Amino acid sequence: MSRIGKIPVQVPSGVDVDIADRVVTVKGPKGTLTHRVPAPIVVARGDDGALVVTRPDDERTSRSLHGLTRTLLANLVTGVTQGYQKNLEIVGTGYRVTAKGSSLEFALGFSHPVTVSAPEGITFAVESPTKFSVAGIDKQQVGEVAANIRKIRKPEPYKGKGVRYAGEQVRRKVGKAGK
């Protein structure tokens, strides 16, 4: 039995879960998220109202999808109650970010400013010219938008300049020795 998959997903008060035709819909104070459950996995409501994820057999695909499905459902419940946020920071002389409505404009050493618009369900917050955050209810979407922003100018290993996650340790290299 999967150690993660056998743990029931607790559903807090104020969150409504609907299971219909292999689609789980979670409604909460922050919004609504849906997830399609893969074929061998079964999701049901437990006695205490929690979501219980089970698998019919011990085949490899069933075992691999068991814990995954449970974790994805737990992420839906957390998303509609608390939401998710990724904090990023910019390191480098002259590198900065400004908010332009619902989009961000970056000055990252290119000959032009780079503009990133917020997809539906994502909000940007700029705390300072070098610190900003990406927030939303869908964990996968928040992570993907943050990764795409980081990809614009990844931290380089010699001076560490670029966009990085808050608290990220950049592996540094020693430059070539001068004469």
UniProtKB/Swiss-Prot annotation:
<keyword id="KW-0687">Ribonucleoprotein</keyword>
<comment type="function">
    <text>This protein binds to the 23S rRNA, and is important in its secondary structure. It is located near the subunit interface in the base of the L7/L12 stalk, and near the tRNA binding site of the peptidyltransferase center.</text>
</comment>
<dbReference type="GO" id="GO:0022625">
    <property type="term" value="C:cytosolic large ribosomal subunit"/>
</dbReference>
<dbReference type="Pfam" id="PF00347">
    <property type="entry name" value="Ribosomal_L6"/>
</dbReference>
<comment type="similarity">
    <text>Belongs to the universal ribosomal protein uL6 family.</text>
</comment>
<dbReference type="GO" id="GO:0019843">
    <property type="term" value="F:rRNA binding"/>
</dbReference>
<dbReference type="InterPro" id="IPR000702">
    <property type="entry name" value="Ribosomal_uL6-like"/>
</dbReference>
<protein>
    <recommendedName>
        <fullName>Large ribosomal subunit protein uL6</fullName>
    </recommendedName>
</protein>
<dbReference type="InterPro" id="IPR020040">
    <property type="entry name" value="Ribosomal_uL6_a/b-dom"/>
</dbReference>
<dbReference type="GO" id="GO:0003735">
    <property type="term" value="F:structural constituent of ribosome"/>
</dbReference>
<dbReference type="InterPro" id="IPR019906">
    <property type="entry name" value="Ribosomal_uL6_bac-type"/>
</dbReference>
<keyword id="KW-0694">RNA-binding</keyword>
<comment type="subunit">
    <text>Part of the 50S ribosomal subunit.</text>
</comment>
<dbReference type="InterPro" id="IPR002358">
    <property type="entry name" value="Ribosomal_uL6_CS"/>
</dbReference>
<keyword id="KW-0699">rRNA-binding</keyword>
<dbReference type="InterPro" id="IPR036789">
    <property type="entry name" value="Ribosomal_uL6-like_a/b-dom_sf"/>
</dbReference>
<keyword id="KW-0689">Ribosomal protein</keyword>
<dbReference type="GO" id="GO:0002181">
    <property type="term" value="P:cytoplasmic translation"/>
</dbReference>
